[in-house]
Every structure is written in structure tokens, then in C-alpha cells.
């Protein structure tokens, strides 16, 4: 049974091009499920019944797992059984008509532009090359709206300050080129010219942002850095995701259209961008209609100033 799980994870990597973080999440969710099923002595995946699935979901509920966690694990299990059915490893799919718990989507609140400005100035109070590094990281994260996983995955070769552009590899290995201008470009240039060489121990790591050992900074490392600055501002709930959300909200408030923000964030669907930015459903529908029928009349109906 474990072998088929490994084959499924390999399929997600090779065939679907999912990122390492996503694969790791699938493994975490499905490992627990596999252990549960093995203990029930079902013998093979073809013997797993709907009752087994319901028993697992009840187990998670009794263990007081968050509804969002249960919903995510249900989705992973469904994907796994769809794969098994496609491979003819099972004849019937026990996850058909299996309902996932409804999850309320709690999005982080956007901080104000003034709060962003305060945050971006704080690294200047940190002495040494780390201050310039932190300044560059925060500036780039807010200026581009990229995910923190994308930020720490950047290599020096992804930056082209001559044309003010950063190459970013997003979900499903989709590449997008993001503009980097103004204070973000200046901060990044200063970091590269002055600080990075001081932080780098052997000069061999291609990573753009380095930790104190000269190695690639991790997501957890960035989180600790951000948390330290956020607490100094009294913003204890600030997360990297909050900065991404603030970027999108502020872009719309400045008159950027929904499609442009969608492309910058790397969203496959505009509905995701609509949820991210608290844009009304009616506004998104109007934009879709205008995009499908690009007439002057329709374009005039779409209002993007907030």
C-alpha cells in the first residue's frame, strides 16, 4: 500500500509538476491516512470502503483537528483514489460523493500603506549587512506580491536590475517576470553591491538571500526575521501572507485592474484574485463580461478605482 502512495507522489511531481512544498503536504496528509488504513487490516486499497473513510474523518474530528486540516486531507485522499482508479488499481472509488467539511475562508487583513512604510524602514536600524538584506527582502516581497516560498527560492541569476525585472518560479513551475522598480530596486542593488558578499561564506551558493551561515535563507528563517520587525511595530499578527494580501489590495486601490493583479500574483483563476482582494462578485463578473466582449460600452461599465 505504501508503494502505491510513493508512486502517486512521484506522479504528482513528474506528471503534474507540483512543487516540493505541495508534495510534502500531500505526504503528510496521506501518511496518516495510510497508517490508519493499515491498522484496520484492509489488506489492499481495493478493499477500502466508504465506512473506512468515514471512520478516518471521525478520528480526525475526535482528535480536534481544524476543519481546514480535515478538508485538506479529504481532498488529498480523493486525489489519491482518483489516481488509483485511473491506474486500474481499484474498480470502484469509495470517495465518490464523499463530502468535504465546509471551511470558512479567513483572509489576513491588509495593513495600511503607512504601516508598510514603517515596516520597510525598520531594517535600517539593524546594523551590519543583515539590515540591508532584510530591507531588500521586505521591499521585494511587498513590491512584487510574491509568495514567501518564491522569495526564498530566488537565485542571484533571477535578478536583472538593468531591465528592472525579477524572474519568479511559482506554483506548478509557472514562470513569471515581475517588475522591480523604485525603492525596491534600490534596496536590492545595495544588498547585492554591499551586503551579500559580506554574508556569503564561500561565495558558492546561488541563492539571492542568505542566512548568517552563507546558505539559502529558509521560509522559517524569513518568518522569524519578519516576526521580529512586526513585534516592534505592535503588529504581532503580521505574516508574509499579509504583505502579499496588502500588495494586492493597495494595487487595486491605486487603480490597477483585476487581470493585471491576477498576473502579478500568479493566480490561475481570477476568482482566486477576487477572494484575495475582497473584490465584490459583481465586480469580477463585470470584468469577465468586458473581457469576453471588449466593446467600449462594456469597458466603460467596469470601475476599478477603490
From Swiss-Prot:
* A Pfam family this chain is assigned to: Phage_int_SAM_1
- What residue stretches are annotated with the Tyr recombinase domain? 106-289
The coiled-coil segments of this chain are none
All copies of the Core-binding (CB) domain together span 1-85
Provide one Gene Ontology cellular component.
Answer: cytoplasm
Query: What GO terms are given for molecular function?
Result: DNA binding; tyrosine-based site-specific recombinase activity
Localization terms from the record: Cytoplasm
UniProt name for this protein: Tyrosine recombinase XerC
Give the record's subunit note. Answer: Forms a cyclic heterotetrameric complex composed of two molecules of XerC and two molecules of XerD.
Q: Which InterPro entries match?
A: CB, DNA_brk_join_enz, Integrase-like_cat_sf, Integrase_catalytic, Integrase_recombinase_N, Integrase_SAM-like_N, Tyrosine_recombinase_XerC/XerD, Tyrosine_recombinase_XerCD
Q: What does this protein do?
A: Site-specific tyrosine recombinase, which acts by catalyzing the cutting and rejoining of the recombining DNA molecules. The XerC-XerD complex is essential to convert dimers of the bacterial chromosome into monomers to permit their segregation at cell division. It also contributes to the segregational stability of plasmids.
Family that this chain belongs to: Belongs to the 'phage' integrase family. XerC subfamily.
- The residues responsible for catalysis, as annotated, are 147, 171, 241, 244, 267, 276 (o-(3'-phospho-dna)-tyrosine intermediate)
Classify the source by domain of life. Answer: Bacteria
Q: Which UniProt keywords apply?
A: Cell cycle, Cell division, Chromosome partition, Cytoplasm, DNA integration, DNA recombination, DNA-binding
- SUPFAM superfamilies in UniProt: DNA breaking-rejoining enzymes (SSF56349)
Q: Name one GO biological process term.
A: chromosome segregation
Amino acid at each position: 500500500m505504501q508503494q502505491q502512495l510513493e508512486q502517486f507522489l512521484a506522479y504528482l511531481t513528474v506528471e503534474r509538476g507540483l512543487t516540493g512544498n505541495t508534495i510534502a503536504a500531500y505526504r503528510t496528509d496521506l501518511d496518516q491516512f495510510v497508517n490508519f488504513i493499515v491498522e484496520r487490516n484492509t489488506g489492499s486499497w481495493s478493499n477500502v470502503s466508504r465506512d473506512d473513510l468515514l471512520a478516518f474523518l471521525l478520528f480526525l474530528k475526535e482528535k480536534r483537528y481544524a476543519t481546514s486540516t480535515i478538508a485538506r486531507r479529504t481532498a488529498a485522499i480523493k486525489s489519491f483514489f482518483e489516481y488509483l482508479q485511473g491506474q486500474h488499481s481499484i474498480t470502484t472509488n469509495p470517495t465518490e460523493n464523499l463530502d468535504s467539511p465546509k471551511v470558512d475562508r479567513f483572509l489576513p487583513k491588509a495593513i495600511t500603506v503607512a504601516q508598510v512604510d514603517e515596516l520597510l524602514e525598520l531594517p535600517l536600524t539593524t546594523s551590519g549587512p543583515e539590515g540591508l538584506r532584510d530591507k531588500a527582502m521586505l521591499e521585494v516581497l511587498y513590491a512584487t506580491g510574491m509568495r514567501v516560498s518564491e522569495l526564498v527560492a530566488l537565485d542571484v541569476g533571477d535578478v536583472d536590475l538593468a531591465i528592472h525585472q525579477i524572474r519568479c518560479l511559482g506554483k506548478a513551475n509557472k514562470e513569471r517576470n515581475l517588475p522591480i522598480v523604485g525603492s525596491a530596486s534600490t534596496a536590492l542593488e545595495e544588498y547585492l553591491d554591499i551586503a551579500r558578499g559580506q554574508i556569503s561564506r564561500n561565495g558558492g551558493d546561488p541563492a539571492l538571500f542568505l542566512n548568517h551561515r552563507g546558505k539559502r535563507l529558509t521560509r522559517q528563517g524569513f518568518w522569524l526575521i519578519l516576526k521580529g520587525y512586526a513585534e516592534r511595530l505592535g503588529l504581532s499578527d503580521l505574516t508574509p501572507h499579509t504583505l502579499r494580501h496588502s500588495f494586492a489590495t493597495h494595487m487595486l486601490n491605486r487603480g490597477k485592474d483585476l487581470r493585471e493583479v491576477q498576473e502579478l500574483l500568479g493566480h490561475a483563476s481570477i476568482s482566486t484574485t477576487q477572494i484575495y482582494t475582497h473584490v465584490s462578485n459583481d465586480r469580477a463578473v463585470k470584468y469577465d463580461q468586458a473581457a469576453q466582449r471588449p466593446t467600449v460600452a462594456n469597458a466603460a461599465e467596469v470601475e476599478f478605482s477603490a
